[in-house]
Amino acid sequence: MPVDQSFNAPLSEVDPEIAAVLEQELGRQRGTLEMIASENFVPRAVLQSQGSVLTNKYAEGYPGRRYYGGCEFVDVAEQLAIDRAKSLFGAEFANVQPHSGATANAAVLAAIAQPGDMILGLELAHGGHLTHGMKLNFSGKLYDAAAYGVDPDTFLIDMDVVREKALAHRPQVIIAGWSAYPRHLDFAAFRSIADEVGAKLWVDMAHFAGLVAAGVHPSPVPYADVVSSTVHKTLAGPRSGVILSRDTALAKKLNSAVFPGQQGGPLMHVIAAKATAFKIAATEEFADRQRRTIQGAQILAERLVAADSTEAGVSVLTGGTDVHLVLADLRNSPIDGKQAEDALHEVGITVNRNSVPFDPRPPMVTSGVRIGTSALATRGFGETEFTEVADIIAETLKPDSDLAALRARVLTLTDGFPLYEGLTQ
């Protein structure tokens, strides 16, 4: 009996509704400026790896130790991903199987803590992450969570306060990492505090892993017991997670925490795409992109602290940035975070509203916006383009701005930097 006709038919014939969604989304990405700090554009080679026949293969276990036959080629793919991750970050151990950053984080905690243990991380409302102890998240339900925050005047993490919190709570795990904090973390100070209270130090570098890979951001690997990350964001790989460590003694616990602790079969097509992304991240081209990413964020921060923005009630948390994102503070502005997000969307710039520390507004409204530059650097933007983008954003955040004229300026930029040329879906 021949294969069903639908087996070899193109998506446009089998499922025109989904084909239309893909085409529309491609058009949206091409015709707008993507500035959500947790998003990026993956290289075409990563798309090709992920959209491959490896999606067909079940491979529970690890290379050379599978519970299924026929794994000789997916073993090669996973070992490449492991070796490349270790080389890229200078780690002794890597697990590339986590389906996401959240599952990687769940596995880390399962490996280095017991349910009911005390964990200490950055307060969610001050830039932390759900998986660092938020009460409605697994991390706040399974573990006893405490938090440190930022200084109310500088909005910086005060390591003396972190030490005081650690001495008061005596956590088994101290978490260094963030989802909305624009400065470097002092990994050496975190290490010292962890040692003082006998805690494990876990660094979640999901947002800045690409910067670390490029050597333009301090690496947490020499200081942390365990490092976790997503592979998208600044790394520009597939949406997924990775766990790293310099301590090979933790290898068995970490591997067991991922499989069978958190997951069953790994997604081999995604793991292959991770391997491709790690290879690209080791290139000078990638390093240049990360340098432009930081340059773009700093240009934006400088523009938003200029006199006209200040007069419009806009400021920048911490006064600038060391990384790929800027946090615009709108507490003194006539517009709130939701209104700013909507106005920027109208001109063709995609960002997300974001709470600022000590925010008087609710989380669905907020008094800030988080703006990232990774995707634009990937698209090829440099100093000239980022200067124009910064000016467009500054103008958009003013009351009564001409949004139609600003939209035209955005289209000039997108037209000059085509995305995924030749791709139709």
Curated annotation (Swiss-Prot):
Record-level GO cellular component terms: cytosol
Modified residues (N6-(pyridoxal phosphate)lysine): K233
Broad EC category: transferase
Catalytic activity line of the entry: (6R)-5,10-methylene-5,6,7,8-tetrahydrofolate + glycine + H2O = (6S)-5,6,7,8-tetrahydrofolate + L-serine
Cofactor names: pyridoxal 5'-phosphate
Subcellular location, principal: cytoplasm
Enzyme Commission number(s): 2.1.2.1
Pathway noted in the entry: One-carbon metabolism; tetrahydrofolate interconversion; Amino-acid biosynthesis; glycine biosynthesis; glycine from L-serine: step 1/1
Family: Belongs to the SHMT family.
Assembly description: Homodimer.
PANTHER family: SERINE HYDROXYMETHYLTRANSFERASE, SERINE HYDROXYMETHYLTRANSFERASE 1
HAMAP family in UniProt: SHMT
NCBIfam families listed in its UniProt record: PRK00011.1 (NF000586)
Name assigned to this protein: Serine hydroxymethyltransferase
Gene name as annotated: glyA
